[in-house]
Structure formats: C-alpha cells, structure tokens
C-alpha cells in the first residue's frame, strides 16, 4: 500500500500549489497554537475552527494516499502516543487525517499538557518507526519547507516531537513547541495544502504517517542531512523563537535531526513560518512547500535524520533551546527559500497533480513525490542558487519576527502563495538548507553558499546514519563555506571588474612605459651631448650648445613628465574603479612615476642615456636626434665664427703677403719640379713614383747612404766659398752609386728637405722671410733652369757634376747680392737639390728601364 500511495503522493505534492490556500487558514491557527504563549486565547479559538478546516483539507489532500500507509504505521505509534489520536487517524485513513487535525486542535488547546504526554508516549513507539521519524526530522526540513515531502514521516516524528514538547513544555518556549503540535491547526493549513497528514501526524497522524513517512523518509533523509548541518544552528533559534518553528515536532521528532534540519529551515526558511506550521503540520506544509523542496533536495537526508531523531530525540529537546536564537536569524533566509522550495516542488509536481493535489497530494502524495523531486530539487538549487539568495533575504526579515509571534498566520499564507505562485524557485528548496549558512553570513554570501550548501546536503545524504553528528559539523561547514563564498563572491564579482581593471591597468602600464621611452628620449637628448663633444673641440661653441641641449632636455623632460603624469593620472583612475583590485593599478601608476624620476638623472649622465636610447624608443631617439641636430647646426654656425677667429691669425700673415698661401703652395709644386723643366719632369715624376714604390722594396738598405749624402749637401753650403768643386765631387760620387736608390725616395726626400730647411730659416728669420724665400727660390730655380740647362747640359754630359753646381751657386750669389749666410746656404742647398733632382730623374729613368727589363724577365716583384 505504501509504495502505491507514494506514487500518488508524487502527484499530490505537485498539487502543492493548492496548499497555499489551505496554509492560509491553518497558518492562522498555527500562529495561535505555536505562538500560544502570547495569543493563547486566539489559538484556542482558531484551532477549534481550523481543525474542521484542517480536517476537511487534510482528508482531501492527505487522506487518499496517506491514509492506508498512515494507518499501518500509525496504529503502533498511536497506541503509544495517545489512544484518541491513534484511533482517529487509523480509522479515517483517508478521512482520519481530517479528524486528527480535530484531535490536534484539542491538543493545541491543551497544548502543553496533552502534547507532552503524547510526546512521551510517542517517542518510545516512534523509535520503531524511526524511519518515519526521519521524516519528522524532515519536519525540521519542513520548517525549511523541504520536510513537507516527508510530511507523513514527519508525523511519526511528531510523535517523537511530543518528547520535545515536554522540553518545550518545561520551557515556555517548549510549550509553544507543544503548541506547534497543537499548531496542528497550522499543520492543518499546511496539511490542507499538502501536509494535512502532518497535522494529525504530529499527534494523531503520527501513527498513520509513519508507514508513509518511512517510505518518503528514506528519500527525505537526503534533504534532512543537508538541513541537519544548518539545523544545528537553526535548531537553536527555533527554541529561542519559541515559535511553532521550534515546534519541537521537528526538534523532538528527530530531536537532533529535527532541530538540526527543522530548526534551521524552520527558523531559516519561511518554512519556519510556514515551517513552524510545517513542524506542527510538518506533514502538512512539507507536502506543499517543504515537501516539494525538502523532498527534492533533502529526501535522502531524511533517512539519516530518522536514526538521529530517535537517538538524539531527547538531546534535541535540550539542544533546540540553545540554537533557538539562530533559527530566527536563519529563518529569514529560509523563509524566502521555503516558499521558493515549495514553488519548486510545485513546479515539478504541479503539472500532474494540479487538480488532485488540492485534496490528496498533500499527505501521502507529498511524501511520494518528495523523494523524486528531492533529487531534482537538489540539482536545481545549485543551478538557481543565485536567484534563491536574493529571495531569502527579502522574506527573511519579516519571516523571523512573524515566525516568532505570528509566523503561522502571516508567514504561512505568504509562504504558501509563493509556493503555488512561484514554482520556479524550486531551486530554493536546496537553498533553504543553504540559507541557514547565509544566516551566519551575509545574504550575498548565501547566494554563493547555496551551491556549496547543496554539496553539503549531498554529503549528509551519503551518510544518513551519521547525519546527527555530521549535522553539527555540516552546520559549521556551511557557514564556513558560506564565509568562504562570501570572500569568494566579492572576488567573483570584483574579478570581472578587476579583469577590466587589469586591462585598463595594463593600458595604463603601457602608457607609463611609453613615458619611460620618452624619458629615454630625454636621455637621448642628454646623449645628444655628443654635439657638446664637438663643441668641446670647437672650444668656444661648447658654451652655447650646452644651454641648447639643456633646453632640449628641459622641454623634452617637461612633456615627458606631463605625459608620465597624464599616464599616471589615468592609471589611478582606472585603478580607482575597482576599490579592491585598484592596488595593482596604483602600483603600475607608481612604476611610471618612478620612470620620470630617472629622467632627470640620465640627463647629467651620458652612459645611461645611451643604453635606454637603443632599448625602448628608437623613434623617440630619432626625434631627439632631430632636436639635437638643430643645436648641432647652431654649433656649426658658431664653428665658422671660431674659424673666423683663426683667420685672424692668418690675417697676421696676410699683411705680410696676401698671396703667400698660394705662392707657398706653388713653391711646393716648384720644389717638386725644381730639379729640371717642370713640364717635362712632372710626367716622369708620376711614373717614377709608381716605380719608386717597387724599387723601394729592393733598395731599402741603400736608402741610408743617401741620407748622409744629403747631410753632406746641407753642410756644403756652409763651406760655400771654399771647395765648391769638392762638394760637387762628393755629391757626384755618392749620387752615382745611390742614384737608383735615392731616386726611389727622391720625392719624399724632396718634401722632407724643404721642411727641414724651413724650420732652420724660421729660426733665423720670421715666417715672412721664409715665405719670401719660398717665393724667391722658385724664381731662382727658374733662372737656373733657364740659364744652366741650356748652357750646361752639354757640360753635364761631359762633367755635369763639376759645372752645374758652380754655375748655379755663382748666379745665386750674383742675383742675391747679399752676404747673408743663411740665404746663401739656402741657395746652395737648392742648387744642389736641383742638380740631384736632375741627375736622379735621369737615373730614375734608367732605373725604371732596368726594372722594366727585370720584370719582363723575372715577372712582377713578389717580395711584398
């Protein structure tokens, strides 16, 4: 029967949407019952009235599927719980559900006393039905809205719940808990929608639901397990709340599980509000809201809750009070989620059950459906975790106070409508457990935590037996995870921004990099100092160019600094948008700031600028080069000025001889041609030069003798008057031997000889005189060439050495008409050089001819 009923319950839970309306009425009843402490009178009144309604609703919803299973399980527990309750639920089966609400209504009236006895009785019998009791543990879930799935199971736990009620009875709050069972009215509303069985189940139904609950319990435990962790926290609040939520039903039912699962969800989820009703109506509301939610995610967890509920039932009674405050806090998030959960279950089951749910779906159908959607809900919550967190926060604030005082009345209706209205929030079903963790953490955290909470729920489902002990750790864990998600959540949101920020920061970084490049360009400007080096060579221009590069550096540095500032300013701006991650961007900004600082430093140092120039900004360097070129051109302009100053020194020479430079150059040419007719000798001289290079290699050792010969020639002029002939002989003798050799160096010697002579003359006479001499010499040479060659050439053929020097010297003395020894010596040297040149040229020709012959025979020289 039970299995069969379970399938139908599936459709019934779907009808959960109908439950919302039923919830409204029962909620009012529940609020009086659960809140009995304050509105005890209204509770008494309304409970009586609602019981009929509950009865009517319950039979419609729960009666059909749940009755048989409930009767089976309930018979045993009912005996222990209370004969009236057992009798009523068992016979009605389908309708008994409605009657149990009536009995329940009575119980609410005598909530404290009647409930406590049933609880005491039930706990013992319930032990055998623990499986259903887990469902009761689900009622805690139902508090969250998941329990509804375990509605009937919760009923059995409700029997266990009475034990909790004693604890509640002991404490004023406990009494409210007992009232919560009395809240059966509330349950009735819930039951009417989906958990009608739960109402009676708590007191009367408990016997009947156990069978049905057992089946769903197995499924529900999963949800319960997740809830259990949260319950640990929430459980405390239920007691403190003294709300129907505390409704020991959950706590008592699975004292541990119920408090854990129910408390968190009861106080946490609207379930507490409606869940409070749910606990009482654990079977009722759970079917509608909690059942759908709990069923989907938490059905597996319920099983563990069952065992726990039995074991920790007593403990739970004590425990709930401690967590009492937390459930309230948690309740807000749970409240929001509970409706959503209900809606989830509704969404899942609604299509098939929509019409049937109105009557039957709540009790057994809910139980049956709960297992199936439970898993689905579990999955969904993870997906829609984001949406869930938002809803819980909104509902959370009101549900807590309302749950405490009027939770059944106000919250239940709103919760149920959302359940029916918003089937989509099904995901919230999972979230309901998660919301407890959010209670400890901010709502946003809840959103993040929700997915994580779901995993926690899965773990409880894995170890249902361990759920009690694991529940507490899990509870702590969800908050921890919640806190972690909190931290994670902000980063998650921020990361997207930080990503953009990082991009911006990167852009900013790049921009600062560009400024450094400009800085390097500034360094390049400093490097441009090379123009300064040129200026140093120039001496005076150095000063003007130095300021010019400074200006360039300043100008470049100013734009660079501005650019760096502009870049750095945008960098902080980009960094500012993300407060958290702005740090990275500020750091980047700092880097560019430091870059401009080095800029001034490289200016003085040239080495550093040279390095950065090639490194980062060749383009900038080019620009800097252009800028530098400008000062360079300026320095060049100054250079001509300096040259103008040097010309001043030349001007000193100009007054003496304006044409001197030209003439001096001419004398050089003349010196080369002095020996013989310039026109004729020039061409051979070129040839001789080329040949001389070759001959020089062979005649290197012979070069030395000509040097002393030359020295002798220089000495000869000193003894001009004495033996000119002797000099001629000496000169002729060595000339003959080394002529070929000397001819090789004849030209270099020629250039050297005048140089040596010039310093001598310079020592004796001023430069002007030397210039004049250079001028005079050519004339003398010309004269000698004209006179001597024509007349003496034949003499040379006979005895060139003897006649030529004498003839030359005599005319020089005649022409000079001076007694200046220096001039005479110079004339003599020039004459001797001319003779040597003539002889050497002739001999060079001979040597060249010989060399050509040798080359023809031996080939080109290879001694190089």
From Swiss-Prot:
Record keyword Transport present: no
Compartmental location: Cytoplasm
Tissue: Soma and axons of photoreceptor cells of compound eyes and ocelli.
GO molecular function: calcium ion binding
Region of interest called Leucine-zipper, as start-end residue ranges on this chain: 816-858
Presence of the UniProt keyword Cytoplasm in the record: yes
GO cellular component: axon; cell body; cytoplasm
Biological processes annotated in GO: rhabdomere development; sequestering of calcium ion; visual perception
Keyword annotations from UniProtKB, A to Z: Calcium, Cytoplasm, Sensory transduction, Vision
Domain of life, per lineage: Eukaryota
Location, primary (coarse class): cytoplasm
Function: Plays important roles in both rhabdomere development and in photoreceptor cell survival. Might function as a calcium-sequestering 'sponge' to regulate the amount of free cytoplasmic calcium. It binds 0.3 mole of Ca(2+) per mole of protein.
Oligomer status and interactors: Homodimer.
Protein name per its UniProtKB record: Calphotin
Organism this protein belongs to: Drosophila melanogaster (Fruit fly)
Lineage of producing organism: Eukaryota, Metazoa, Ecdysozoa, Arthropoda, Hexapoda
